[in-house]
């Protein structure tokens, strides 16, 4: 099998719906749709190119499988034509992809991205609070209405019960009490008071054991207190007498003369003691003078 000599690659592309037709369709689509749909057009174009290549390869290979090749020169021509067609298709696909990319870039620059989420207004929190308060008020009103309806439905029963109670009280107050009943109640009250008075015993402190025990305790404590004060006074008097008798004038003179030398003592010892006392006295006087100064 061989391709006819008059046939060209461009003609075959036009017959099989090649890239020339897809280029025109793609330019029309890119002019009609915005830049945000460029990805979908690119994917559809690539799918159409792959489908055309597969269909073309199947159509070109099917006759080769059915018919045996005649000469090696025809096979070489077919392979060269196929390689040329593939190169042309690759070039066209690259051109189409670059064209779509440039269109997409221009559309992104000219138009803002529509897929971005809208900016939240500054007063959204206040609006939410207001909406929440409104909803709570409405819910409270609905609950209040339901409560009022329930109360209204329960009112007749309460009114009936009140009316029955009031009528029974009025009947009880308006009824007349017989005199026999009054007399009987009076007699019962007098008997109860007399029995209560008879049950009460008069308290006699001299005969009461608790009072007697308390009186004995008080007398004992008073006796102990008086005895203690008496003993303390006697002890104090004895101490005073001892002090007066032991510290009379003579005893004091004797205590003063205890430090004096005796007549039997050696005069050297006496002078030595006197000098020591004088030195002690002078040293004490000097210290006192230095402190005063």
From Swiss-Prot:
Residues 52-71 have a biased composition (Polar residues). It comes from the Eukaryota. Residues 8-17 have a biased composition (Basic and acidic residues). Pfam families: DUF4606. Residues 1-23, 52-83 are annotated as: Disordered. Transmembrane segments: none annotated. This is Uncharacterized protein C8orf48 homolog. It comes from Mus musculus (Mouse).
């Amino acid at each position: 099998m061989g391709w006819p000599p008059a046939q060209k690659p461009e003609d075959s592309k036009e017959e099989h719906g090649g890239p020339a037709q897809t280029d025109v369709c793609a330019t029309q689509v890119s002019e009609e749709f915005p830049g945000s749909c460029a990805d979908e057009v690119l994917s559809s174009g690539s799918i159409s190119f792959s489908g055309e290549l597969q269909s073309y390869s199947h159509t070109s290979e099917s006759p080769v499988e059915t018919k045996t090749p005649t000469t090696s020169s025809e096979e070489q021509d077919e392979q060269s034509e196929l390689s040329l067609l593939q190169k042309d298709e690759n070039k066209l696909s690259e051109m189409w992809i670059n064209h779509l990319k440039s269109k997409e870039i221009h559309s992104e620059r000219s138009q803002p991205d529509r897929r971005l989420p809208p900016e939240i207004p500054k007063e959204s929190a206040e609006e939410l609070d207001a909406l929440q308060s409104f909803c709570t008020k409405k819910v409270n009103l609905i609950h209040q209405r339901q409560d009022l309806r329930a109360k209204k439905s329960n009112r007749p029963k309460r009114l009936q019960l009140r009316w029955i109670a009031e009528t029974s009280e009025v009947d009880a107050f308006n009824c007349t009490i017989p005199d026999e009943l009054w007399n009987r109640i009076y007699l019962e009250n007098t008997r109860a008071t007399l029995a209560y008075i008879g049950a009460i015993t008069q308290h006699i402190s001299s005969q009461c054991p608790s009072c007697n025990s308390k009186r004995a305790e008080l007398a004992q404590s008073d006796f102990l207190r008086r005895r203690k004060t008496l003993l303390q006074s006697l002890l104090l008097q004895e101490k005073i007498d001892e002090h007066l008798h032991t510290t009379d004038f003579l005893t004091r003179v004797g205590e003063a003369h205890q430090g004096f030398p005796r007549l039997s003592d050696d005069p050297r010892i006496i002078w030595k003691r006197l000098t020591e006392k004088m030195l002690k006295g002078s040293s004490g006087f000097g210290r006192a003078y230095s402190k005063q100064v």
